[in-house]
Amino acid sequence: MEVLRAVSQTEVIRDVLLGLRSGQWQFDPDPRNQLGLYAQVFRLDFDDQPLRDARRTVLGLTWAHALAGPGNTVFIANPYGGQESPRQSLPVLDFRLAGLRLGLQRDLGAGWRGNLGVQWEERRHRGPDPLFGRIRHDRQLDLRLGAEYPIGPRLLINPQLLHTRNHATLAPNDFRRTQLLVDVQYRW
């Protein structure tokens, strides 16, 4: 068993800038399985809308399982829950959340590693929206297809296709969105 903490200077700087505090516990019961618990606390600040300033707290479990066979395939599951509470007393912006992430990663060949992910999250607000007179309830589904490829010793490129469907009780929050994202990561 091992307690992991953010100790690198870059992670500490990032956490201070983002207002994030986190902790993680990780346990490897055998060479093919990894279990974990984590806690995250975010301080959300909105420059133009200070009424939305909030604290978001999330607790979760993680399980990663390396499948036998070719491709170095790894299955990942992550149930989580939490709440977001505004600093002002506004029940319309106060909500509880619960979700589940499932993922699969696999070597694709020629240096590429693919990933497939599904995420479901439910958010239940505590007070009625003043404009609509109803309590907001969201059920969001994200589907992600991506890959990563090393373009240097510590540099990776990550193209991803993400589709989001948010079912909401309030029409302005009910939407579909598809995004093509490409990011470049430097691993310290």
Where are these regions (language model features)?
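Gram-negative and organellar
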Residues: 1-188
